[in-house]
């Protein structure tokens, strides 16, 4: 088995907190220099590299002399603001020694949810790569409240992979890869060397929380691979403790777990719909509507909706659930939540009499709908 990095041209590399800090107590500058050196060698082989690096909050904790990761959002934001300065300065110093420029890019869900800002971010990243600059990306934790509570850089790295249409996402962690069970608890656990991204069995294998310093467990990495696969990108989950891991992967050596993108690649706009917009509510469908969407490729009509949850406005994203509560699709809704409740289970020709107007005959048009 050969590593998917060997034939790849554009790569997103995500480095976890444990690989860039001194056990969470500030940045490990020798480790950052090591990652920079490997990235430089990849670039010399003709590969383009975007780096998603954790470590800002851990560095902020060190500078503020905090021994434990705080739980209060405003304290996390303060740590991120202080630590981001040190993180970017350290990387800049490392890359300058190789006569390369680096660029800081801080993103939030809001940046990627707005179509215009999404396209601007993509253009900026493409320009930086053309200029031989190494983009260093992190979440803008200082302003993104819900990202600090629920987000992680694994997810961000996957969304960046979609954004720039990278060939491979490499997630480096302190574990060797994905195992059939938790190797810390089960001595019979075996490394999964290769599997299909999005495989339900693989998602069941993954579990457990991350460290006190970082936020991402193995499940977030497996779900990140599923997201990356929507733009046709493969994912490698490997140990950053392996010597020269990036260089060896680029040479074709199989290290860690490869999760292959074997699903149909979504068009760029539908990738944006699937992963870059936050869901504001859910609608539950009957079996007929599920079949119409999943098999027939139809639009979602109000008659096929049995329940509405959430408080959403026209044009926002809602998840489409089957009768068992499993999300099968999501899309941009043509009516707000209150209106949707009034027209559910009703034929489209009744909408005007129920609401006093008709915007669209569909609740979600198929052009604004993506199957998951």
Curated annotation (Swiss-Prot):
Source domain of life:
Bacteria
Give UniProt keywords alphabetically: Amino-acid biosynthesis, ATP-binding, Cytoplasm, Kinase, Nucleotide-binding, Proline biosynthesis, Transferase
Q: Per the annotation, which location comes first and is thus the protein's main one?
A: cytoplasm
Gene Ontology molecular function: ATP binding; glutamate 5-kinase activity; RNA binding
Question: Which top EC class is named for this enzyme in its record?
Answer: transferase
- Give me any GO biological process, just one: L-proline biosynthetic process
Q: Heme: present as a keyword of the record?
A: no
**Record-annotated residues binding substrate?**
54, 141, 153
Give the CC-aspect GO terms. cytosol
Give the CDD domains listed for this entry.
AAK_G5K_ProB, PUA_G5K
Write down the chemical reaction(s) this protein catalyses: L-glutamate + ATP = L-glutamyl 5-phosphate + ADP
Task: State the pathway, as annotated in the record.
Answer: Amino-acid biosynthesis; L-proline biosynthesis; L-glutamate 5-semialdehyde from L-glutamate: step 1/2
Q: Which residues bind ATP?
A: 14, 173-174
Residue ranges occupied by any PUA domain in the UniProt entry? 280-358
Localization per Swiss-Prot or TrEMBL: Cytoplasm
Q: What is its EC number?
A: 2.7.2.11
* PANTHER family on file: GLUTAMATE 5-KINASE (PTHR43654), ISOPENTENYL PHOSPHATE KINASE (PTHR43654:SF1)
The free-text function statement in the UniProt record for this protein reads: Catalyzes the transfer of a phosphate group to glutamate to form L-glutamate 5-phosphate.
NCBIfam families given in the database record: proB
Recorded protein name is: Glutamate 5-kinase
Gene that encodes the chain: proB
């Amino acid at each position: 088995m050969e590593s998917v990095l060997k034939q790849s041209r554009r790569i997103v590399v995500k480095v976890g907190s444990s690989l860039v800090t001194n056990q969470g107590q500030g940045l490990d500058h020798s480790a950052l220099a090591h990652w920079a050196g490997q990235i430089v060698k990849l670039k010399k082989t003709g590969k383009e590299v975007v780096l998603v690096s954790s470590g800002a909050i851990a560095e902020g904790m060190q500078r503020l002399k905090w021994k434990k990761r705080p739980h209060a959002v405003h304290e996390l934001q303060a740590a991120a603001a202080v630590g981001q300065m040190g993180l970017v300065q350290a990387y800049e110093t490392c890359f300058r020694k190789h006569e390369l420029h680096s660029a800081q890019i801080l993103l939030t869900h809001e940046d990627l949810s707005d179509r215009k800002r999404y396209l601007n971010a993509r253009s900026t990243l493409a320009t930086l790569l053309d200029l031989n600059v190494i983009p260093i990306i992190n979440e803008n934790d200082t302003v993104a409240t819900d990202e600090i509570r629920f987000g992680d850089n694994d997810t961000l790295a996957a969304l960046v992979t979609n954004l720039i249409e990278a060939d491979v996402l490499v997630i480096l962690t302190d574990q060797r890869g994905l195992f059939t069970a938790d190797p810390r608890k089960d001595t019979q656990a075996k490394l999964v060397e290769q599997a299909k991204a999005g495989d339900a069995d693989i998602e069941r294998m993954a579990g457990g929380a991350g460290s006190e310093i970082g936020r991402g467990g193995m499940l977030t990495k497996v779900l990140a691979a599923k997201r990356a696969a929507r733009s046709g990108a493969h994912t490698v989950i490997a140990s950053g403790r392996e010597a020269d891991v990036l260089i060896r992967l680029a040479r074709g050596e199989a290290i860690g777990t490869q999760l292959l993108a074997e699903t149909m690649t979504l068009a760029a706009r539908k990738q944006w719909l699937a992963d870059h917009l936050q869901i504001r509510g859910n609608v539950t469908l009957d079996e007929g509507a599920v079949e119409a969407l999943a098999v027939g490729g139809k639009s979602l009509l109000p008659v096929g909706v049995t329940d509405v949850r959430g408080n959403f406005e026209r044009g926002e994203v809602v998840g489409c659930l089957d009768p068992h509560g499993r999300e099968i699709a999501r899309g941009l809704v043509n009516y707000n939540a209150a209106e949707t409740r009034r027209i559910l289970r009703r034929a489209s020709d009744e909408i005007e009499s129920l609401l006093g107007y008709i915007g669209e005959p569909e609740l979600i048009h198929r052009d604004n709908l993506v199957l998951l």
